Amino acid sequence: MSKKRNIILIFLLVLGVLLISGCWLISTPTYTITYDGNGHTGGSVPTDSTVYKENDTVTILDKGDLVKTGYTFAGWNTQADGSGTDHAVGSTFIIGASDVTLYAKWAINSYTVTFNSQGGSAVSSQTVNHGGKVSKPTDPTKTGYAFAGWYKESGCTNAWDFATDTVTSNITLYAKWTPLYALRDTGPAGGLIFYVKEGGYSDGWMYLEAAPASTEWTGKQWGSYGTLIGGTGTGIGTGQSNTTIIVNWLNSNTDNTYGDVTNKTDRAAYLCDALTLDGYSDWFLPSKDELNLMWENLKVSGVGGFAGNVYWSSSEFSANHAWGQVFSNGGQNFNYKNYSFRVRAVRAF
């Protein structure tokens, strides 16, 4: 009986030792946390080497150097498609009785597409997702120009293809413009273009058009001989104001010594100002420099029907003289205002 009791005691003692030491046949289950880059294009996924038991607290790791081109990291999720439970970096959760895989959650980047119309009408910007295409906007407009497409740089070398080009960053597209008219083209009033303003449309005009040869006058005086009207200029862009100044003087003058009262409507500037052709009535006598451009860009090229004689400009030189130009050789000289020369009207638009 004593021997049997001893055996039982020994068994119980061994059992107790096993229980105390944890060396029992049944072990406690453990679980792992795995991080998945979910389509990342660079960097390495973080590694959690901790062995967890059910109900342990898990702290969510940072993404480290994990990246995906065109996307921004937005935390972790229990499903690859992002439909599961979100877990922010640094947050915690209680692990259950299973391994857990956390998938990187990526938010697609969006970019701003800005349209620089380079002097044309405004075009609204667009927001486009990474890899997306830009919607072609309505063409802008610019006075004096024809729209010629959108380009990737202000110099307009590489065109943007709305059908194939995609957006991968914030970009600016630039409008390209081509002049509606080139030198020696026929203008809207039927004359020839003899000047295209280098800086483009400004101050209400971009082109100078010479009236057709059929409108030219011969044997016309400048007027105001013996009187300095003053205020006229010689530069490009001054012909119209010159003409207005001269016509105003002719209309207010009462001295008919040289016939400027009775013959005012037959003076060079007055004739140009009164011209109406194909609905256009904005003609004027060209300034000295404008007259030279007409000789240089039309007469020298053999177009425009110009004679080789002297033509009047609207630029006054003195009380007795005004500037004219010999169209046979281009020479510019001041001449007596009561001399009779040819007159060709021009317009700016």
Locations of regions flagged by a protein language model:
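Short, flexible loop/turn elements at secondary-structure junctions
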Residues: G39, A80, G119, P212-S214, ...
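Short, compositionally biased
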Residues: C23-S27, N109, K176-D278, S328, ...
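Short, polar loop/linker segments at the starts of domains and inter-domain junctions
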Residues: T41-N55, G84-S91, S121-V134, N158-T166, ...
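Sec-dependent, cleavable N-terminal signal peptides
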Residues: M1-I26
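C-terminal, surface-exposed recognition/capping segments
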Residues: A74, A148-G149, T178-P179, E198, ...
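Secondary-structure capping and domain/repeat boundary segments
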Residues: K3, L25-P179
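Residues that flank catalytic or metal-binding motifs in active/ligand-binding sites
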Residues: Y31, T72, V100, Y111, ...
